[in-house]
């Protein structure tokens, strides 16, 4: 059973280009005609002063325009986007099973590449390690809280930027629509040697999170440096559930349940239900890395959260006039303070912190994507 929701499409007005045209200014009266009275040329002092002033203004204006253009065309924002660039043609993120073999291979290679790049936030480790580390570092304010959806929207965008900027990836983040695989998630097309690998090796001893080492696929042999709060080098681990327990977990994301969640009328109710059901399903069914907040060590994490972002986007598009700015609920699970669009999203040093208001629209200049 396929899960389709046909939201109302929001029509965006074209955004005026930020490029500025530079016009050369020429003074047609700039030539000075003087009369010769012999071997020397006489020039009115007032005219001379005027000529000097015009030259100074012209040179100053030329250099000002030059430096302005240099700034406009060389400055990059903290998210890797050129400042004068506007979102005119948003990229479309696609479901994993719809990608070609070449597109899948390019994505997997870019993810592997992150493990070869130096850390941005610590003195050791890799860029790959940074994402689970930051996810754990910020977890108390980004889970069971209103910030869950907006924080992860920005977080996965930073991940996509890293794939592009550091590893030359040219595609977009794919997503995994687990509602298509609710009856037997272990047979989902994201698993297998040519995808993200399979279940952990049941013949080996238990690793972390009731999982075992993944021994097939491009991430076999990957070393995860942290497990929750602890420095604990270990293999990429998974421990698939099966039987009646798996059936119960699958029911959390079956199409009918997801469709019911999409009918929630306010952000707080929608966000709470989507976080509760999706997190219970993924962490309970895959286990291993997903058992703790260092779950981003499993590369499937990003396909999972891109799907959550997709569902939020669909929910927003059902009533864009109101929902593109609708954000409410508890700001943190340990406080009664209400959430605000002015709340800060702490990215743990991966990129500059932003306000929630900055990440509400996926077709903004910051993101420029759709589903």
What are these regions (language model features)?
Residues 37-55:
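Membrane-interface recognition of transmembrane alpha-helix starts
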Residues 44-46, 50, 60, 66-371:
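C-terminal accessory segments of proteins
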Residues 1-43:
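Short, low-complexity, Lys/Arg-enriched N-terminal segments of secretory-pathway carbohydrate enzymes
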């Amino acid at each position: 059973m396929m899960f389709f929701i046909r939201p109302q499409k929001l029509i965006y007005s074209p955004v005026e280009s930020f490029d500025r045209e530079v016009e050369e200014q020429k003074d047609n009266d700039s030539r000075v005609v003087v009369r010769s009275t012999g071997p020397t040329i006489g020039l009115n002092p007032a005219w001379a002063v005027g000529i000097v002033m015009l030259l100074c203004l012209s040179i100053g204006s030329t250099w000002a325009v030059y430096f302005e253009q240099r700034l406009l065309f060389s400055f990059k924002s903290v998210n890797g986007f050129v400042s004068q660039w506007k979102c005119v043609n948003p990229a479309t993120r696609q479901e994993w099973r719809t990608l070609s073999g070449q597109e899948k291979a390019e994505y997997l290679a870019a993810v592997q590449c992150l493990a070869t790049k130096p850390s941005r936030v610590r003195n050791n480790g890799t860029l790959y390690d940074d994402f689970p580390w930051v996810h754990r570092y910020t977890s108390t304010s980004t889970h069971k809280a209103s910030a869950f959806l907006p924080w992860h929207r920005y977080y996965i965008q930073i991940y996509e930027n890293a794939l592009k900027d550091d590893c030359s990836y040219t595609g977009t983040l794919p997503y995994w629509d687990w509602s298509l695989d609710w009856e037997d998630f272990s047979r989902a097309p994201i698993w297998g040697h040519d995808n993200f690998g399979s279940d952990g090796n049941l013949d080996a001893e238990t690793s972390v999170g009731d999982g075992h080492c993944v021994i097939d696929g491009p991430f076999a042999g990957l070393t995860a440096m942290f497990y929750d709060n602890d420095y604990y080098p270990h293999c990429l681990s998974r421990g698939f559930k099966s039987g009646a327990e798996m059936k119960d977990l699958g029911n959390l994301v079956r199409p009918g349940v997801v469709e019911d969640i999409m009918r929630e009328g306010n952000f707080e109710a929608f966000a709470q239900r989507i976080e509760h059901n999706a997190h219970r399903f993924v962490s309970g069914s895959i286990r291993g890395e997903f058992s703790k907040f260092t779950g981003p060590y499993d590369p499937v994490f990003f396909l999972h959260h891109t799907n959550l972002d997709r569902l939020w986007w669909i929910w927003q598009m059902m009533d864009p006039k109101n929902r593109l700015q609708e954000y409410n609920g508890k700001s943190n699970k340990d406080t009664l303070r209400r959430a605000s669009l002015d709340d800060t999203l702490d990215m743990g040093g991966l990129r500059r912190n932003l306000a929630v208001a900055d990440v509400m629209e996926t077709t903004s200049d910051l993101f420029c994507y759709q589903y």
